[in-house]
Amino acid sequence: MPESISCGGVIVRQQQSTVYVALVKEGGVADYILPKGRLKSGESLEEAARREIEEEAGLFELTLVGKLGVCKRLNYTRKRWVSTHYFLFLTRQVNGMPTDKKHDYELRWFAIDKLPGIFWPEQEDLIHANRERILRIFQ
């Protein structure tokens, strides 16, 4: 079965004492996701993650904290394996204007302890598994 490589990010910011996570959803779709997408030829993993975050969330003022890990799953059509490399980014940017003109993405910030249902279960697991690491950034 073919495999593709994707990259994305967990983007966090703090407002007062609450830590928020950026999630996106496409118009007409009920569930939120972390911004992510395919690696393009010639890009580093981090460059691809930053590009996808800007395209889907409109966030570009990003400080890399580190790599969170790789999640592997079947794609939506269950015909291809996808390995997604996730990075943790810190931002002070609140508003974003997604740059992907082919899709209608909406950015929303959610408190880390009040996340909505996330379409891809491994993304929700990734956030929960790294919760303490994320919170330590702001101590």
For the regions a protein language model found, what residue spans apply to each?
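Class I (Rossmann-like) S-adenosyl-L-methionine-dependent methyltransferase catalytic domain
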Residues: M1-S4, R13, L74, I112, ...
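Generic secondary-structure boundary signal with a strong preference for alpha-helix termini
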Residues: Y20, A49, R133-I134
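N-terminal strand-loop-strand
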Residues: M1-L34
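Catalytic cores of nucleic-acid ligases and guanylyltransferases
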Residues: Q139
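Unchanged
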Residues: G37-G66, V70-L126
